[in-house]
Each structure stands twice: as C-alpha cells, then as structure tokens.
Swiss-Prot record:
Family that this chain belongs to: Belongs to the RecF family.
Keyword hit for 4Fe-4S: no
Binding-site positions, ATP: G30, L31, N32, G33, Q34, G35, K36, T37
Protein's UniProt name: DNA replication and repair protein RecF
Gene behind this protein: recF
Annotated localization: Cytoplasm
Length: 366
C-alpha cells in the first residue's frame, strides 16, 4: 500500500496541512514539539480509527476548534486508488471511504494497515500486562475477523458478568448465562493467541538477529502466559464455575483471557527484568518488523511503516541495520531531529515547524 496524499485540518497543533508523497521514503525533520509525531499519528489513525498515543479522541482536535479531519489518498494492492476521510468531533468520529460512510469497524479494520515504531513501544517490554494485551488484541483483530468477533463477544459477556458480581448476591443461573458465552469465546481467543505468539516469536528472533549482527548468544522469543489454558468449552465452564466464590469476594472476574500476559525473553530470561535498555529497544523494533512481515503475509497488503524518532538511542551500526531490515517495497514515513544516515538513499524531506510542513526545495540524496 502507498500513501499518496495526506491532508490534516484542525488536528493537534496543525491548522491545515496538505502533503503529497512521491517515492517510498518520506522524512519529517524538525525540533521536538513541532508536529512531526502528529502527522504520523494522523496516518496511523487510518488503520483502526484510534491513536497510538491516546484513547481520548477529544485531544486530537486542535485547541479552540470543535471538529477536525484527516483525508488521505492511497493506492492499495487489492482496492486500487482509494480516498479515506475521517471526520473528528468531540463526541465521536465518522469514516468515509470513496464517499461512502463506513458504519461497522469490522468492515474497515485491517484493510489499510500501518505499523508504528514509537518510543512508547518500550512499554510493551516494561509496562503492565494490559498494554501488551491491548497491542495483541488490536494486531490480531486487524488480521482475523473471527478473532474480532470472539473478542467482542467475550468483552460484552465479561462486562455483564462483572456487573452482576459488582451488584452482589448474583444467582448461579445468572452467572451461568454469561459463562455460556464467555467459555467458547475464551477457547477461540486462547487458540489464536497461542498460534500467533509462536509465529511472531519466530519472526521476532529472525528480525532481532538482523538488527544485532547475528549474536547467537542473544536467543530471543515471546512467552505466552495465559491465566488458564483450558483446551475446551467444557474446561472453561468448569473453571468459571469454580471461580465464582472468589470472584464474588472480589466482585470481578479473576480468570480469563482478559488476565493473560506475554513476555519478551532473552537467553531464557524475562527481558523486562534482565535485558539491557539497548536489548529492549532492539526487541521492540524487531517485534514491529515481525508484525509488518506477518501482516503482509496474511493480507497481501504491505503496511505503511511509521517510524517516530525511534533510532536516536541506538548506536550507528544498529540504526543502519534497522533501515536495511525494512522491506524495500514498503513505504516508510520517518521522523527525526536530524536527517538519516547518508548511505540510506533518497528521501523526500519535509521540514516541520509549529505545525507547518514545507517540502525541501530539492530532496537531497542523503
């Protein structure tokens, strides 16, 4: 997929910007706080109608404005030339595809993929389990409609069961009604997560090896940590039933896919506790490379890669290896406070200042 044009209106600190992209490499250069990340955020919003920086869409609308908009023109491997427009309001958003309003998330999710490389990705290694679950759910839901349906079913039934538990004195028959919905959905989520993390772990290891010059001592992977690994609906029903007393005590559901986690592993140990900062940064870069490769294999569509000033903390050799690891047919939009290394070929460069984007008079061969 190629992003040809991107237009922002009243988005973050950008009053208006219209950028035309040529070639596959665009670089946004400028000081911090000028709007580089805001443009990548807008491009990433195309994938799942959500920001990679915040869950509060009101923050996306420029201060003093009531609405905002993102418009894009893309060339897609299966869909051809397509125009997307996202209209933002303080109470919601609308998506339009070629002048037709899209009303179901399932009809859009994953069709126009992007993969974001962000400094916030370090939280996937260091942060709370909820961050890793959210990333995993978004990634799998964008690739697998069955996973999205199971996740939606599970989330609704979980909310209803928790409401009963919070109320107190829930009857077994009431709990059972929601457990009958939870159990088969949990089986589906567990199976998909298990297979996906095994595959992503293998791809992560290959990508990490490329970034780290084949250091065989640094064997890496992903380790799935389910709260319960029941193989069948019957096993899950029994587990939910046996947990009712404790769940009633704490007034919430204490077991299920919503309590799962996974960890990054280096040399057989948890990267969260034992890996250096350099290893952790390389792990999350490798994870995103693995995600992009797998997404292309699953959908036939190359995601647009969005790299938000993620390489500044890496040594020059590892930075060069990262750029060399990018699929040569993929488009990449990158940001930084200085231009990329000289041997990385020709970039279309935009200078960014105070929410304004100016194309370089001549794109230097950097």
């Amino acid at each position: 997929m190629r992003l040809r044009h991107l237009t922002l209106r009243h988005f973050r600190n950008v009053g208006f910007a219209a950028l035309a992209f040529s070639g596959r490499q665009q670089f946004l250069v400028g000081l911090n706080g000028q709007g580089k990340t805001n443009l990548l955020e807008a491009a990433g919003f195309l994938t799942a109608l959500r920001s990679f920086r915040t869950t509060d869409n009101k923050l996306l609308i420029q201060h003093g404005q009531h609405t905002g908009a993102i418009s894009s023109e893309l060339t897609h491997e299966q869909l051809g030339d397509t125009k997307l427009t996202i209209k933002l309001r303080r109470d919601g958003k609308e998506l339009w595809s070629d002048a037709t309003r899209v009303t179901r998330l399932a009809d859009h999710l994953g069709r126009f993929p992007t993969v974001v490389f962000s400094s916030q990705d370090l939280h996937l290694v260091r942060g709370a389990p909820a961050l890793r679950r959210r990333w995993l759910d978004l990634t799998l839901a964008s690739m697998d409609a069955g996973y999205l349906r199971a996740l939606q079913t599970y989330s609704r039934a979980l909310a209803d069961r928790n409401a009963l538990l919070k109320r107190g004195n829930a009857a077994d028959a009431e709990l059972d009604a929601f457990e009958q919905q939870l159990a088969p959905a949990a089986v589906a989520l567990l199976a998909t997560r298990t297979a996906a993390l095994a595959l992503l772990g293998a791809k992560l290891a290959v990508a990490y090896d490329r970034l780290c010059a084949g250091d065989a001592a640094e064997k890496v992977g992903l380790h799935y940590e389910p709260s319960f690994d029941g193989p069948s609906t019957e096993a899950w029903l029994a587990r939910f039933e046996s947990s009712r007393g404790r769940d009633a005590q704490f007034r919430t559901t204490l077991v299920g896919p919503h309590r799962d986690d996974f960890s990054f592993v280096v040399r057989g140990t948890a990267a969260k506790d034992f890996a250096s900062e350099g290893q952790q940064r390389s792990l999350v870069l490798a994870l995103r490379l693995a995600q992009a490769e797998w997404g292309h294999e699953k959908s036939g569509t190359r995601p647009v890669l969005l790299a938000d000033d993620v390489l500044g903390e890496l040594d020059p050799l590892r930075r060069r290896r990262f750029w060399a690891s990018i699929d040569p047919e993929s488009q990449i939009l990158a940001t930084g406070t200085s231009l990329p290394d000289a041997e990385l070929g020709e970039w279309q460069v935009f200078e960014v200042k105070s929410g304004e984007f100016e194309a370089a008079a001549e794109t230097p061969e950097l």
